[in-house]
C-alpha cells in the first residue's frame, strides 16, 4: 500500500513482463530454426538475452531481498542461495563481453540479419515514438558496429525486441511503460498509479 514500494515492485514486475515476453518469442524461434529468419533471430537474441538477463539478475535478487528485509536475508529463504549463485550465470558458457561479441559477429556474418530485424519489428512501428526513435538509432549504429559499442548495441537490441513483443501482445499501458523504462534517453520516469496497479495485479495473479 506504500506508494514508494509500489513503484519498486511494479518496476520489478515490468522487467519480468518484458523478459518473459521476449523469451517466449525466442523459444518459438528455436523451435523453427529450419526457417532462415527464425535461425537468425535465435542466433542474435540468445546471446543478447543471456547478457542482459544475467547482468540484471544480481541487482534484481538483491532488490527482492531488500523488499523482504531480514526474512529475505535468512537462509530459510530461497533468495540468499539465488543471490550467491546468480553471478555464475554471467560466467557459465561465456562472460558478458563474449555474449556481446557473439551478437556483433552474428550481425557481421549472417546475411540478412538487419533485414530480418526490420521485418520482425515492422508490425509495431508507429505505435510508440520512443521505440521508433531507438530503433532508428540502433540501425544506424549497427550498420558499422565497433567492438567498443558491443554492450550498448546488445542491450539496446534486447530492449527493443522486448518492446516489440509487448507492443504486439501486452496491454498498451504495459508496453508504453516498458518503452519509457528502457528506451527513453532522458532517464526513467515514474509509473502511473494505474500502471502500477495493473502490473502488481498481474504479478500476484489477480
Where are these regions (language model features)?
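Flavin-dependent oxidoreductase catalytic core characteristic
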Residues: 1-206
Amino acid at each position: 500500500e506504500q506508494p514508494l514500494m509500489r513503484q519498486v515492485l511494479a518496476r520489478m514486475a515490468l522487467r519480468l513482463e518484458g523478459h518473459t515476453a521476449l523469451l517466449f518469442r525466442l523459444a518459438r524461434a528455436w523451435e523453427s530454426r529450419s526457417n532462415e529468419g527464425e535461425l537468425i533471430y535465435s542466433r542474435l537474441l540468445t546471446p543478447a538475452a543471456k547478457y542482459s538477463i544475467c547482468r540484471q539478475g544480481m541487482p534484481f535478487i538483491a532488490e527482492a531481498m531488500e523488499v523482504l528485509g531480514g526474512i529475505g536475508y535468512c537462509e530459510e529463504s530461497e533468495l540468499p542461495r539465488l543471490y550467491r549463485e546468480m553471478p555464475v550465470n554471467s560466467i557459465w558458457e561465456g562472460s558478458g563481453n563474449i555474449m556481446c561479441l557473439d551478437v556483433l559477429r552474428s550481425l557481421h556474418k549472417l546475411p540478412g540479419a538487419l533485414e530480418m530485424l526490420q521485418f520482425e519489428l515492422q508490425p509495431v512501428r508507429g505505435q510508440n515514438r520512443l521505440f521508433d526513435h531507438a530503433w532508428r538509432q540502433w540501425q544506424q549504429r549497427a550498420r558499422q558496429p565497433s567492438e567498443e559499442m558491443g554492450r550498448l548495441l546488445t542491450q539496446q537490441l534486447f530492449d527493443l525486441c522486448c518492446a516489440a513483443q509487448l507492443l504486439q501482445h501486452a496491454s498498451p499501458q504495459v508496453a508504453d511503460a516498458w518503452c519509457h523504462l528502457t528506451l527513453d534517453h532522458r532517464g526513467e520516469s515514474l509509473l502511473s498509479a494505474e500502471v502500477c496497479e495493473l502490473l502488481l495485479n498481474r504479478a500476484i495473479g489477480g
